[in-house]
C-alpha cells in the first residue's frame, strides 16, 4: 500500500459509486381490465432499459402474469386477477423500482340478467343475477334492490351471484352490485315485487249502513301498514269506489277493514299498494 505522511491511501481515497436513473412510469393503456385478469396493458415511461434486462411489473402490489420488454420506454404487462380501483403500477429494472403511480382500476361489476324479475312481497326467496366482473372469488359482494340490501348474497362465479330478497313492496327497483370499492352503474336491470292479489272476503256481506269488519285474504300486501296501502269496495272510478275504513295490516296475506256504507250485490273489492291494483274480486254484497 502507498502511504503519504503515515496515511494509507486505501482508507483515505473516496469510493466513487455510479447508478442509472430508476425506471419511471408515465402512463398506461388501457387503464382498466376485467377482474378475471389476463388482459394486456402497455406501460409507457422511461429507463426501462436500452436492451431487455428482464423487467418486472406490479399492479396493485400483485406481479403481472408476464412482463414483456419492448423498448426503453415501453413494456407490456399481462394483468393479474384483482378487484377495485386506484391501483398502483410499479416497474422494476436491474433491482431499481419506479415510484408507485395510481393509474389502474378493475372494471366495475355489470349486472345484465335477473331471474326471476318479480316475486312476492313476503320476500325470503332467491333470485340469480347474471353479469360480469363479480370477482374471481368471494370478496363480500353486496347487492341492493333499490335501497333495500339483499338478506343474503352468495357468490357463485365471476358471472353469477344469488340474492335472498328482503320483504318489501314496490316496482322497477334498480339492481346494484358492489365488488370491492366499485359499484355497478347500469340502471337497466330492475326488480319488482308482485302486485296485490285478492282471493276472498270474509264475511262476504254487510248491511247497507256499513261498519262491519271484514277480512280481505290474498297475497302481496307488503310488510307493514303504509299510506299507499288501500282497499276499496265498489266500481273502479272516483264516483263509485268506496275506500275501506280503519284498514289494518295483519300480514302479507290478510287485511282487515270496516266496510263503508253502500248498496248492491257482487261488488268488486280490490287492494292497491304503491300504485299497483289487484284484479277485482266480486265476492262481496250489501
Language-model-derived ranges and their functions:
Residues 1, 88-92, 174-178, 268-272:
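Extracellular recognition modules
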Amino acid at each position: 500500500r502507498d502511504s503519504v505522511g503515515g496515511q494509507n491511501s486505501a482508507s483515505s481515497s473516496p469510493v466513487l459509486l455510479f447508478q442509472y436513473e430508476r425506471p419511471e412510469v408515465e402512463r398506461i393503456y388501457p387503464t382498466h381490465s376485467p377482474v378475471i385478469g389476463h388482459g394486456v396493458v402497455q406501460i409507457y415511461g422511461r429507463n426501462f432499459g436500452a436492451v431487455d434486462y428482464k423487467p418486472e411489473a406490479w399492479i396493485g402490489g400483485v406481479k403481472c402474469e408476464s412482463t414483456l420488454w419492448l423498448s426503453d420506454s415501453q413494456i407490456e404487462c399481462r394483468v393479474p386477477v384483482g378487484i377495485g380501483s386506484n391501483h398502483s403500477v410499479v416497474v422494476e429494472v436491474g433491482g431499481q423500482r419506479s415510484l408507485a403511480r395510481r393509474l389502474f382500476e378493475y372494471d366495475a361489476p355489470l349486472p345484465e340478467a335477473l331471474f326471476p324479475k318479480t316475486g312476492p312481497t313476503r320476500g325470503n326467496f332467491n333470485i340469480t343475477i347474471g353479469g360480469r366482473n363479480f370477482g374471481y372469488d368471494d370478496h363480500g359482494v353486496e347487492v341492493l334492490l333499490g335501497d333495500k340490501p339483499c338478506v343474503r348474497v352468495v357468490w357463485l362465479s365471476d358471472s353469477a351471484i344469488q340474492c335472498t330478497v328482503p320483504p318489501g313492496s314496490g316496482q322497477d327497483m334498480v339492481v346494484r352490485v358492489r365488488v370491492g370499492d366499485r359499484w355497478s352503474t347500469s340502471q337497466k336491470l330492475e326488480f319488482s315485487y308482485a302486485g296485490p292479489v285478492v282471493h276472498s272476503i270474509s264475511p262476504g256481506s254487510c248491511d247497507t249502513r256499513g261498519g262491519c269488519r271484514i277480512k280481505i285474504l290474498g297475497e302481496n300486501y307488503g310488510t307493514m301498514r303504509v299510506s299507499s296501502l288501500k282497499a276499496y269496495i265498489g266500481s273502479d272510478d272516483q264516483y263509485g269506489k268506496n275506500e275501506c275504513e280503519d284498514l289494518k295490516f295483519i300480514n302479507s296475506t290478510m287485511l282487515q277493514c270496516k266496510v263503508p256504507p253502500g248498496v248492491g250485490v257482487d261488488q268488486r273489492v280490490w287492494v292497491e299498494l304503491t300504485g299497483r291494483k289487484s284484479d277485482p274480486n266480486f265476492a262481496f254484497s250489501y
